[in-house]
């Protein structure tokens, strides 16, 4: 079953797996809210943060001019995909960006790969050093920090 991002609120159904195989496609179309964004099954989205531009008044020594994200990316979502352990080819093992509109919904149909590994030898998304993103956060200088439990980073 694909992962998804859906609006939450009155009348939404968050019952998987209790409704699995008990409802047909038509029932689902008539009684549920479609996700606004889908993600590959087994990609394991663990951490999500929304970029909140910081116009920090710190000195240039603290925040160099060439390292942070621009204000134009304010509100974008960044999601850490921990990655699959049980599928071939592997999926996940990356950080994606989801541009968000003023209404709080994604402005794209699919998340945009932001930090990922593309291996030409056939091992897929896995990083050779074991890197597996867990969470993402921005520092006061608008730089994205990524944690990994595969490398201790």
Per-segment meaning from a language model:
Residues 1-127, 131, 141, 153:
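Beta-propeller domain segments
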Residues 137-153:
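Blade-level signature of beta-propeller repeat domains, shared across WD40, Kelch, NHL, RCC1
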């Amino acid at each position: 079953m694909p992962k998804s991002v859906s609006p939450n609120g009155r009348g939404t159904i968050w019952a998987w797996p209790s409704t699995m195989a008990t409802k047909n496609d038509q029932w689902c179309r008539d009684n549920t809210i479609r996700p606004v964004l889908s993600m590959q099954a087994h990609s394991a989205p663990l951490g999500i943060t929304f970029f909140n531009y910081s116009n920090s008044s710190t000195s240039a020594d603290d925040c160099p001019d060439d390292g942070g994200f621009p204000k134009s990316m304010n509100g974008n979502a960044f999601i850490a995909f921990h990655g699959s352990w049980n599928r071939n080819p592997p999926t996940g093992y990356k950080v994606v960006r989801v541009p968000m509109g003023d209404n709080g919904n994604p402005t794209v149909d699919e998340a945009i790969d932001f930090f990922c590994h593309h291996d030409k030898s056939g091992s897929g998304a896995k990083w050779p050093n074991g890197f597996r993103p867990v969470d993402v956060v921005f520092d006061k200088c608008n730089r994205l920090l990524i944690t990994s439990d595969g490398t201790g980073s």
